[in-house]
């Protein structure tokens, strides 16, 4: 159902929340997640706060010293992110085909419109 659920794939353990992402839920998920890998989609419908809120997420990840981060959505291009940014989930899917993740504990979260669940088959 894409709402916060834990799942084990053949290669990784995932926490999947591909239904809703707003600044509060994104920050809470990052703070409570005990894993090492983050795949985060854009937060949509933030209007004039889009840049600020996406930068806040990037800053949280940097402060946490996250091991591996992939960001999905053009909204992240406005930030000073040190992490790879993919404009679409399809772009990240292609990248992961050539750079598969193995034995990671992954938080997969993004707004419904980013369709983060499209990555499940490759994770």
Give the residues covered by each predicted segment:
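ATP-dependent carboxylate-amine ligase
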Residues: 1-123
């Amino acid at each position: 159902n894409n709402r916060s659920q834990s799942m084990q794939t053949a290669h990784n353990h995932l926490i999947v929340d591909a239904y809703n992402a707003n600044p509060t839920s994104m920050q809470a998920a990052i703070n409570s997640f005990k894993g090492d890998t983050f795949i985060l989609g854009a937060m949509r419908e933030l209007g004039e706060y889009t840049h600020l809120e996406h930068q806040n997420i990037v800053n949280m990840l940097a402060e946490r010293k996250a091991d591996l981060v992939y960001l999905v959505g053009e909204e992240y291009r406005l930030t000073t992110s040190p992490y790879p940014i993919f404009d679409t989930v399809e772009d990240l899917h292609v990248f992961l085909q050539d750079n598969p993740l193995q034995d990671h504990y992954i938080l997969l979260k993004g707004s419904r419109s980013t369709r983060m669940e499209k990555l499940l088959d490759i994770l």
